[in-house]
Amino acid sequence: MALDIDYVLSHISQEDKIALLAGIDFWHTHPIPELNVPSIRSTDGPNGIRGTKFFAGVPAACLPCGTALASTWDQNLLREVGVLIGKECLAKGAHCWLGPTINMPRSPLGGRGFESFAEDPHLAGAMAASMITGCESTGVISAVKHFVGNDQEHERRAVDVLVTQRALREIYLRPFQIVARDAGPGALMTSYNKINGKHVVESKEMLDMVRQEWKWNPLIMSDWLGTYTTIDSMNAGLDLEMPGPSRYRGRYVESALQARLIKESTIDSRARKVLEFVQQASRAPVSAVETGRDYPEDRALNRNLCANSIVLLKNQNDILPLPKTIKKIALVGSHVRTPAISGGGSASLEPYYTVSLYDAVSEALPHTEILYEVGAYAHKMLPVIDRLLTNAVMHFYNEPVGTERILRATQRMSKTAFQLMDFNAPELNRGLFYATLTGDFTPDVSGVWDFGLTVFGTGLLYVDDELVVDNTTHQTRGTAFFGKGTVQELGSKTLNAEQTYKIRIEYGSANTSPMKAIGVVHFGGGAAHLGACLHVDSAEMVRSAVKAAAEADYTILCTGLNHEWESEGFDRSHMDLPPGIDALITSVLDVAANKTVIVNQSGTPVTMPWADRARGIVQAWYGGNETGHGIADVIFGDVNPSGKLPLSWPVDVKHNPAYLNYASVGGRVLYGEDVYVGYRYYEKVGREVLFPFGHGLSYTTFTVSPDVVFSQEVFRPEEPPTAAVKIKNTGKVAGAQVLQLYISAPHSPTPRPTKELHGFTKVLLQPGEERVAHIRMDKYATNFWDEIEGMWKSEEGIYEALIGTSSQNILAKGTFRVDRTRYWLGL
């Protein structure tokens, strides 16, 4: 679209100019129809495009989580993923994708760790840049996030991140710096938190770094409800407050202008940037209505992506791949029939479909007898009862139950979990409303059923008009719904199979709750989760699983975490698997260790006290729509695993360098590990990990020549050398290997990590094939942040280039030199 920005600015009213600086609703910018300025739509999330609705949304493609994407170490593949993200945005009528997330998972406990890419800033930045390039090739703008330091969820709006300038530059800002240099996305989202005493959204120092030092000029938008002031945020450089209606702009900007606390030129500058964003975004050929686009080629890409993200952690005695001639196989675990396709929070969406491991194994082994047992549940809340519920409908009112009420809206329901943060209806009071959900529930098994109701608001559950759960006055804050919900309140009732019961929930919106919380984001209308299951005997479930494993030729035990354990809004309190899972795994290994493969699904590391006893361990992350197919493709050898860990896997959470400095204490968190994040710390102090950064096995074998050959012996930042080694597939099947280039400065007088990743390449080789692999060093390979000079410094001297297949498996070495010490700023 042709938008004459100068003309608009010269003909626009002051009121409309200021209105441009905030959204009009949850997802849209302010339009000016008389000057042909359209409204621009943005949308979540990090692993799929939800569209404009958390509640009753249009289905979408669900991609593997961020750590899964990074574990491919495949920039070309992530470019394809970015294109798919862009196309999904267009189908949802969205011009701007709120992603990717490139914060640093300094601790395995971070609630959004699964959204991020890697503990290493080079890997995170490179993978994000590829994804952004793909997305923006479709015309959709990427809003990379969260700038910067939103590395925990605890009190994320209030916490003050205390971090040295060196760590800030070398670790936490570096991914954004790489993205700015290699992709230059059109938008940047600020974080909720403070950095060294100042909210980022109000920090002129931080935002000037982007525009002045880096010469990158994106639209800078706030995170949702992450604007806290009028004057400071305007003067710092925040262009767009989201969402709308505005809380800190509008008439407050007018008042500040009259008091000369904000200059008119500042308003013009912010409005110009918003109009530039509108001009760029409006060129995208978006759909007029939100639609789906579930195409075969997208399914194939998603399946390939899931399989290539899987990391083979352990394969003792080559237990994998499993033969397809198995006569009897046991499938054990909570994730076998209910795959964990994504984490929670902004990553949540309604998927087009899901493929379970049970379905995928049934397809792969059509003539094999399958023994299925849950063994132990992995859910935090009782599972939803969607498949047992019919005729469900929700009615909305402004008045509470028991009073004379006028129906304001009706919504057909297919789920017993809902979030109403962006729900709206004519004449419905969004600040305070009530709803009644009714439906027919037909249990499939007779016995005592446990019901659980979790709310952000208030709720009463009735079964055939009998009150079963009261979650109204005696509420305890839990972790659900971005950290704002209650813990689950429970009740029980004896039910008969195949008999239909009337389910009714009397719900009150968020403001009916007596709970108040500091540091969490308060989104709109609230939420609820109704779950139920037959009251179970945990010991009997384990015994049944052990019996199946003992009888089977092989056992696949698939379990782990899910969106209830890893989510935006809260952090994990420990690194353990859900209660009962370790005991289940140990019991199965007691009878079938030599024929059992453990498949773990989580977005970040979990403790594995049984790891030394397991012959096969597979890390399957949150795999998206094609989770089951991806896992089965690897387990049965249709895909040779090539994934590599983007995170170090500690034995115990206490070994993590952030263990003593995680979560907000007294309103602040100290990044005491400084630049020694992840493998940088473990290597520096000699701490053993369960699996190192970059680790991942294959069904084939490779050899790598021992000497690194350089395109030039002298390193110059303006023309970094290329490192080369020979690599050969010495096995019997085709496979891909990731060669990782680490740089070491052993003679530097400045304390530095033992080595740091500064390049990588993924090489696919046929059996017997040999090739020379070239890895171009990063411009930043030899530098560190000099806090005295306030600049990057590359010291004169001899450096080592180390190439390996993990941070601990170095196979080739070489040396190069920097001929003189240099200082610099910028990209």
UniProtKB/Swiss-Prot annotation:
Belongs to the glycosyl hydrolase 3 family. It catalyses: Hydrolysis of terminal, non-reducing beta-D-glucosyl residues with release of beta-D-glucose. It is found in: Secreted. GO terms for cellular component: extracellular region. Beta-glucosidases are one of a number of cellulolytic enzymes involved in the degradation of cellulosic biomass. Catalyzes the last step releasing glucose from the inhibitory cellobiose. Pathway: Glycan metabolism; cellulose degradation. GO terms for biological process: cellulose catabolic process. Glycans are attached at N471, N594, N600, N625. Keywords: Carbohydrate metabolism, Cellulose degradation, Glycoprotein, Glycosidase, Hydrolase, Polysaccharide degradation, Secreted. The active site is at D223. InterPro entries: Cellulose_deg_GH3, Fn3-like, Glyco_hydro_3_C, Glyco_hydro_3_C_sf, Glyco_hydro_3_N, Glyco_hydro_3_N_sf, Glycoside_hydrolase_SF, Ig-like_fold. Its EC number is 3.2.1.21. PROSITE patterns: PA14. One of its GO terms (molecular function) is beta-glucosidase activity. It comes from the Eukaryota. Gene3D superfamilies: Galactose-binding domain-like, Glycoside hydrolase family 3 C-terminal domain, Glycoside hydrolase, family 3, N-terminal domain, Immunoglobulins. It holds the Pfam family Glyco_hydro_3_C. This is Probable beta-glucosidase H. Residues 387-546 form the PA14 domain.
